[in-house]
Amino acid sequence: METRESEDLEKTWRKSASDQRNTDNEPAKVKPELLPEEEETSQADQDIQDKEPHCHIPIKRNSIFNRSIRRKSKAKARDTPERNASCLADSQDNGKSVNDSLTLNIPRSRMPPCRTAMQTGPGAQKMSESSSTPGNGATPEEWPALADSPTTLTEALRMIHPIPADSWRNLIEQIGLLYQEYRDKSTLQEIETRRQQDAEIEDNTNGSPASEDTPEEEEEEEEEEPASPPERKALPQICLLSNPHSRFNLWQDLPEIRSSGVLEILQPEEIKLQEAMFELVTSEASYYKSLNLLVSHFMENERIRKILHPSEAHILFSNVLDVLAVSERFLLELEHRMEENIVISDVCDIVYRYAADHFSVYITYVSNQTYQERTYKQLLQEKAAFRELIAQLELDPKCRGLPFSSFLILPFQRITRLKLLVQNILKRVEERSERECTALDAHKELEMVVKACNEGVRKMSRTEQMISIQKKMEFKIKSVPIISHSRWLLKQGELQQMSGPKTSRTLRTKKLFHEIYLFLFNDLLVICRQIPGDKYQVFDSAPRGLLRVEELEDQGQTLANVFILRLLENADDREATYMLKASSQSEMKRWMTSLAPNRRTKFVSFTSRLLDCPQVQCVHPYVAQQPDELTLELADILNILDKTDDGWIFGERLHDQERGWFPSSMTEEILNPKIRSQNLKECFRVHKMDDPQRSQNKDRRKLGSRNRQ
């Protein structure tokens, strides 16, 4: 009798164990808010379902992905049954989420692809409990709903973990780099990152593709894996500037970020976006530090005040105090935004407001650059006391060996760099989102400020240049007014005109080529001959729109680098043709490009940028020497529109569509087509025109308003 009872007990125990294993093999459906009394009813319903045929089970539940989830959940349940039970009981009894530190025990590869709903109410409490308990994460059936939620991950994390004000201010104070150093390190790192990305994609393209395991092999590998909690995946390497010697930190390296657990929740693209916004804030802090040094160390120096006349000091330092005040307020607002939450909500709304209302001080400062440079050179030449004092101040350890002139150009460098930083943010925000609209508006305002700065500089120098040219010209034909507010010089130089072989009475052959001098303005061509006294005698002219050029095929050394210039209507209202010879191939192409800018180039026409034309990135800075040349900054990306055999490239810079010539030795070519395509895609996104949908969205929202409740 006792033996039969023991056998019955053993069968009952085996049956319960078998039912438990079957339950473990199914996706977790037990909600954390269920009471212990309800678990028996749920278990009984599960037993009935196990006996019924499985004809209505969705296909998703039997996928490779969900089989791996069930297998890992089963392994964790075997290893830590007591811990799971205690965590579940605590969360049910106390009604609190175990996930206080925002650390979700969901592998990054198992998370929804883009958006996750995490609300700060009772519903969010339930989801937090289920996700914080190992093995009881959101079921695969729930993930599509989470992914389709309109609440973005950044909005969900808003106001969860603010950064203490003292901690953030200490970080700002610890930035040991002056802006000149910060900017150089950042651009050099950008170049190196592109090189690495180019090499990685080339390796993936040329090498063997990654091995794809069959479902059977994948199951065998996972069965052999030891039962262990999900491992933390390596964080994406955004850049390599976290050098301990440079004191240049990344957002993801902040102690508050590491301890909060948000790096386990955010997607890699969102982390890159956070890094882009963080760089804008920290670079502004570095810029403010350098600008403050210009004022305190140089401008307010008592000896400099005694040496310089007030008018000289005004030209030299301009309105730098106004620029410093704007930078201080701008940085303060960025600091407040950082203190609100460890996950930065946005910074482009602040940038937009300041660009629209306060950055006009940059236009005033930069427009004075021509007079500032001239005054500085004159002071160095004429006042020895000033020259010696500046050299002495530059040796101070505060200046880090940087020259005084590098501090004077800080505002122009900053306003240009700020536009590029907003572009980096714009490339990483989600498309058709509010943050994209805000970034586009901020970029548009900054672009207007930068253009106004450039026009201010050019206007000052162009006016003086036009007056100087007008004084040197003597007209053999009807006089043409040169000075105009809408006219500026594009190119000037000497060419040789082919006049044809002629024989004089003494049977001596005259010269085949005669020197002429061309002044090409944006709307006018003036053809001259140089005469003694540094004067130019004008003998022909034509509107620039009535010029045509044609390149001759190489017909030997004599006719090398020869092209035909045709004036459809010259000063005498008739057509004229000139056969001109340049000193080199690059000089010939540069003249042809300037004279007729709408002709087709070697790689792509000027009316189309859709072709996969070659690209280069600048690895050495270059300052334009002539009006048709392009000044290059480190890390600039350019489309190659034309190039010559003697080492010159005619290109278009992607971030502002400026075109010009530059030496090929200043750049290196981007060989990978995927990188080139990505660069063009980002360029089109940054410069896309406002569509009707975006215009409607812009009317509905108010810039700068944040929902922080």
UniProtKB/Swiss-Prot annotation:
Keyword annotations of the record: Cell projection, Cytoplasm, Developmental protein, Differentiation, Guanine-nucleotide releasing factor, Membrane, Neurogenesis, Phosphoprotein, SH3 domain
Domain PH residues, every copy: 488-600
Residue span of region Disordered: 1-143, 194-233, 686-709
Start and end residues of each DH domain: 272-456
Polar residues: compositionally biased ranges: 89-106, 127-136
Any one GO biological process: ephrin receptor signaling pathway
Modifications the protein undergoes after translation, according to the UniProt entry: Src-dependent phosphorylation at Tyr-179 upon EPHA4 activation increases the guanine exchange factor activity toward RHOA. Phosphorylation by CDK5 upon EPHA4 activation by EFNA1 may regulate dendritic spine morphogenesis.
Localization of this protein: Cytoplasm; Membrane; Cell projection, Growth cone
Pfam families listed in its UniProt record: RhoGEF, SH3_1, SOS1_NGEF_PH
MF (Gene Ontology): ephrin receptor binding; guanyl-nucleotide exchange factor activity
Composition bias, Basic residues: 699-709
An example Gene Ontology CC term for this record: growth cone
Protein transport is among the record's keywords: no
Annotated CDD domains: PH_ephexin, RhoGEF, SH3_ephexin1
Record-linked SMART domains: PH, RhoGEF, SH3
Basic and acidic residues composition bias: residue spans: 1-34, 686-698
SUPFAM superfamilies, alphabetized: DBL homology domain (DH-domain), PH domain-like, SH3-domain
Residue positions, PTM Phosphotyrosine: 179
Role according to the record: Acts as a guanine nucleotide exchange factor (GEF) which differentially activates the GTPases RHOA, RAC1 and CDC42. Plays a role in axon guidance regulating ephrin-induced growth cone collapse and dendritic spine morphogenesis. Upon activation by ephrin through EPHA4, the GEF activity switches toward RHOA resulting in its activation. Activated RHOA promotes cone retraction at the expense of RAC1- and CDC42-stimulated growth cone extension.
Quaternary structure note: Interacts with CDK5R1 and EPHA4; activated by EPHA4 through the CDK5 kinase.
Domain remarks: The DH domain and the PH domain are both required to mediate interaction with EPHA4.
Protein name in UniProt: Ephexin-1
Organism of this sequence: Pongo abelii
Upper lineage: Eukaryota, Metazoa, Chordata, Craniata, Vertebrata
Gene name per UniProt: NGEF
